[in-house]
Structures are given as C-alpha cells and as structure tokens.
Amino acid sequence: MKNTLLGIFSIFCVQLFAQNQPPAILNVSSAQNAKTVTYNFTLEDDENDVCTVELHVFKKSGSGFEPLTVNGITGDIGNNISTGTKAISVPLPSDGEYRINIVAYDGHSFDLQAIVDRVDTLHLYSDLKWLEGTRHRTAGAAKLKAVQDIIESLFTSLHYEPSIHTAKFGDYQLKNYIADHYGASSPGRILINDAHYDCVPFGPGADDNATGVAGMMEISRIIADYHFRKSIRFIGFDVEEDGLIGSKAYVGQGGLSVKDTIEGVLNFEMIGYYSDKPNSQTLPNGFNLLFPAQSAAIAADSYKGNFITNVRNSNSKGISDAFEKSATTYVPELKVVTLEVPGNGALTPDLLRSDHASFWTAGKPALMLTDGANFRNKNYHTANDRVDSLNMWFMGNVVKASIGALLEEANIIHGDVYSSDLQVLTAVDQLPGISVEIFPNPMNEILHITSQNAGNCTVDIQTLSGELIFNKKYDSEASGKIEIGTSKWPAATYLVKFETEQGTILRKIVKN
C-alpha cells in the first residue's frame, strides 16, 4: 500500500508540475492562383487548448523586413481557434519578395527559470577547451579558420538564417559570422549577442575571448528551441584585437540595415575570470572620480574580483536594466557592478576596448559584459591565458543572466511559427522582335516553349513562393523548340522566365 500511494503521489506531482506544451503548426502546404495564396496546415496542442492564430506579411528589402498591411485575409485566424485542419487565404500583394509568418500560441507561459538553467557549464568547458589556441590571421591562421568553420557550422545546424559580412583589412579579408533568429511579428526590432573570436598572436586566448565565443554559442543553441516576437542576432566578430576592425566594418559598411532597430547589444568581452581573494581586483586611474559609489563598494569588499562588470552609456540604460533585472531574478548569486560612462566613453578609454564601442559610435544601445581584463586577470594577453585558470560557475552565471535578458526583451512566444518566403511577379508577355509561345496553359505532362529570333536563352521555372523547379540554358539552335516534362510537378501556379540577351519574358502557367 505504501508503494502504491508513493506511485500515485509521484504521478500526481508529474501531472501537477509538468509544463504546458506550446501548440504546433504542422503539415503546411500552400496553393496559389492569380489572386491569392492559401496555406493549409494542422494545428496541434497536447492539452487541446484553444489558440490565437496570427498571420504577418513583411516585404523583404535587402536584409531587412518592412511590415505590410494586407486587407482581406480570411480563414482560421484570430482568437479561440481550436486544433485540427486549418486554412488561411492571403490576397497576393504587388510585385516583390515577401516573408509570410503564421503564428499560433495559447494562453500559457514558459518557465523562464527552467530555460535559463539549461546553460551547461560542462558544455561551456568543453567548448572552451576546443576554442583555446592562437586564433590569429597570421600567427594562427589554421586555428582561426577552424573556429570560423565551427561557428558557421553551428549557426547553420541550428536552422538560423546565417550570413557572412566581409571587409578588407589590408590584404586580409575579415569575416563576421552572423545568425538571425527572426522575430515572428517584429523582425526589424533586434537584440544582438556578440563576441570576437580572434585573439592576440602570442596567446591561447582562453578568457580573451574564447569565453565570449563559448557563451554566445551556448545561448544560440538554447534560443534555437523557442520563438520570439523580436529578432535575436548572434555575431562572431573578426579582428577585434587590432582596433575593433570587424565590428567597425559591420556597423559602418553595410552590416546593419537602415530598416533595423537595434534594441540592445550584449557584447561578451572576457567573462570567465573570477577571484574571491582580497586585492585581486584593481581599478583604472581616475575610476574613483568617475564612479565613486562603485569604487567604494569594491573597496568595501576588499577589492575582490568576484563580479561581472556591466558597462553602458546613457543610451543603453534599457538593455542594461534588463541585464541587471535578469541577474537579480534568475541568477541572484551573480554580483553585477554597473558603470555608466559619460557620452560615448571618450573620458574612459579603458571602457572602450571592445566591440560595444562600435555600436555606441553609431548611436546603438550596447553593453560590454566583462570580468575586467588586465585589471583582474593577470594572464591577459599572455601565454598563460588558459582555460584551467577560469571559473566555470562564474562564467555560467554570466551566460544565464544574459539569456534571461534576451528571453524577456525579445518577448518569447509560447507557441509555434511557420515562415514562408513568397515572390510575386507580374507576367511580361513579349519582347520587341522576339516571338515566344508557352503552352498549354494549364499545362499537362509536357510544357512546350517555341520561339523565333530568341538566340541563346535560359529557361527558369519556379513556384510563386520562389522555389526553383527547373533551370537550363539553351543555345540558339535548341531555343526554337523546347519540351519540358512536368508530370511529377505538383498542382500550382508557376512562373516561367524565358531570358534572352534582349530581355526576359515572364509568363504564369498553371498546373491543375
């Protein structure tokens, strides 16, 4: 009887404390005609909660997204949507490239503490051991390339939208690795977590800055499992050690879209060195004059290097407050010392030695989260900057406070998001001096294209959502009579592009 009661009690506890699961959007298909695109999908929820379903349309412009109001959307959209087979029809907007987001969520919330606690110090340590080594464009080019590859591979494997921003630094082409986890309803509002991945030529760079890279990688793994209203962007910056070259190029040479609103940057700059010994923390000259309260508090604690420094300017108060709140809420054992520099930090050059400064110069809110570099870690920029000198508990807590801030500020959704890219193009029937016939329409098992005076051409056929179905080049002899087998193509509306030296003919062809 005792064992039976314990079993019943255990089941009750599991049921009582089990997390409500978010709804899921599954089995999505789309059908398109000349006027609308219809999305068919299955809405599932383990608890059969009714959901709110939204559809957002954005016009793609370069690397940015512009919200678009589309009237006449019909179907299973709005509040109190039950589970089951659903459909939403969207009137086609004007010519252009678009992002369509379908969002479904219930009335529940995630346990954010549980997400924060997913940060794994053993994982951080493993990443640090691998990252440790000379990551420098001349003194350690092979190791630098290996780290670049692992960052790119991680971002791709997590199904983010990765990109590489490049710029020249002398004869060297620097590479900033970027991964975007786009927001469901406000993708142009962006939170950034960054770290530079290079190091000085004469050190293994464990604290500076493998800790930052490992922390960013850990957050990117965890964040990938969730959806947000706003976008979260991860950036691995190159050539920081030569004067913030990578981040300056990113901010000033096309890395940021003019349509983007950067709501906060969490820049990791050495986050792993900790000491609870008296006099392990020194301060820059004049620190006590600019920051008297913080200086007095550090002195009262016997100058122990047992805190993370949260460096902000006045424009960065919002993201700074979010980090402090997260530390207090989710990691109360992490001691945070916040410094607000005047203006953009011209009076405090020691607080401008990392990539946050590039964002400050551009008027973007950014923090430098740091253990204090050479004012605490005497292994800074030496061959002794190794993993085994670092404190995983401290580093893990910094990462936890950071991910907590991102969860809150990016507005996590207890739900699912389906994204689809849509291309809308108006047909062009003819070109001067060229005769082209594309038939039959609707097509059957063979699509015929005949032409006169076309010369060399390329035939490109894609769905209206942009998926490439067929692409082939033809010389002038073959272009007059082309036959394309279409028996295996699904029913849809297709865009046929017949491209010649004189121009491009576009025709919409339907398969029923």
Residue ranges, per PLM feature:
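Active-site-adjacent substrate-binding region
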Residues: I271, K277-L422
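C-terminal outer-membrane/trafficking sorting elements
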Residues: D429-N512
